[in-house]
From Swiss-Prot:
Job description of the protein: Necessary for efficient RNA polymerase transcription elongation past template-encoded arresting sites. The arresting sites in DNA have the property of trapping a certain fraction of elongating RNA polymerases that pass through, resulting in locked ternary complexes. Cleavage of the nascent transcript by cleavage factors such as GreA or GreB allows the resumption of elongation from the new 3'terminus. GreA releases sequences of 2 to 3 nucleotides.
PROSITE patterns named among the record's database cross-references: GREAB_1 (PS00829), GREAB_2 (PS00830)
An annotated GO BP: DNA-templated transcription elongation
InterPro entries: GreA/GreB_C_sf (IPR036953), TF_GreA/GreB_CS (IPR018151), Tscrpt_elong_fac_GreA (IPR006359), Tscrpt_elong_fac_GreA/B (IPR028624), Tscrpt_elong_fac_GreA/B_C (IPR001437), Tscrpt_elong_fac_GreA/B_fam (IPR023459), Tscrpt_elong_fac_GreA/B_N (IPR022691), Tscrpt_elong_fac_GreA/B_N_sf (IPR036805)
Keywords of this entry: DNA-binding, Transcription, Transcription regulation
Name of the molecule in the record: Transcription elongation factor GreA
Amino acid sequence: MVEKVPMTPGGFVKLQEELRWRQQEERPRIIEAIAEARAHGDLSENAEYHAAKEAQSHNEGRISELEDLTARAEVIDLTKMSGDKIKFGAKVKLVDEDTEEEKTYQIVGDQEADVKAGRISISSPIARALIGKEVGDSIEVNAPGGSKAYEILQVSWG
């Protein structure tokens, strides 16, 4: 059975845009670079040729990965999400019970995670601890820097 990959509509669009760019812009540019490097003669010591072939390999690998991800994507319509329990797509406001520092995170798919932008992967330790909880609940997260305790202040959607 094919495992679905949950993602937000915005995350899906970003993957589609990257796939289009790699197929329609980057692939032709690399093919042109290979042809140009090949024209320089001896390929055994041709650094430009080897660099272009390596770039081609990387690009084709990423294209395959993006095609797989978009085929398995389960786009979750966040506008239809509601309720008090935390699940995929929720924006969660937390307070660190030790430092009183407040943080807001949105739980997103693995491909969309960007901690600096406040988006955490659904498979991250903190998101796994949050799933199923509600406002007022406390969670404990075992992170590389040690154990942290948070209280859930707010859950919102969209």
